């Protein structure tokens, strides 16, 4: 690690070196990859299967974003930024989404999609792809074992039945091709996180993990820091911290909150992330912000970028309907 720091090697190149001879489970997608990576790693660890894990966020179960294990299996978050995920060699891929993001790097939505198709082509022989149902380039994905998932669409290979919200938790059955797992309870909020969990469950099924162990692991899953994380939860007030920084992620967050707290006033405190993303996704952000009952807009967080003339939070406010 010191050698890498001194000579400036990027993280994904480092991951390429240390995973090239392992059985690799690589989680990609413009949305949800951190959560799904943590879910897969948790299912493997809790069930006793074992894995090495490189997460993009801090696991609420284990208070770390990395752990090691003697089993030569690696669960890794495959980051599309700068096409760095193309350096990995997956045995199992999960592709949660391929929506336009990082357009400062890719230029066009088509180039983002092209990168994900190229990522699918990195799959090792005999490998498996688990992809969100309805991806724009789904017809171009090729694998010996290919599954799609969508919790609310029975046309998907993996879907959900008997979904209920009971005391703030989701109770459901997952139906797959030739298998079914009832009595699942997910305590993490957000309907999108049901999708994320059934993707992780599909990976666990590919590894022949017992259903009972999957049920127990799902019930014990506590989430990832800043992904639908309850900072406060009382009878009077609920405060949720979430890293949602794309219109689709923000919409999923708000929908998830409504599914659990349908009769509560929803106040959204939102800080846009990156000037380029705010500019490229301005219309989507404004439309999504209108879904909240009350909105508090903070100045844009620039991260690695310099300010852009005319790109600011007021621009989003001016495009809102404010109904």
Positions of PLM-derived features:
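Phosphate-binding loop of NTP-binding sites
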Residues: 10-133, 137-146, 198, 204-207, ...
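P-loop/Walker A phosphate-binding loop and immediately adjacent motor/lid segment at beta-alpha junctions
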Residues: 7, 111, 122-127, 252-261, ...
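Active-site regions of enzymes building and remodeling cell-envelope glycoconjugates
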Residues: 5-6, 91-94, 143-152, 157-161, ...
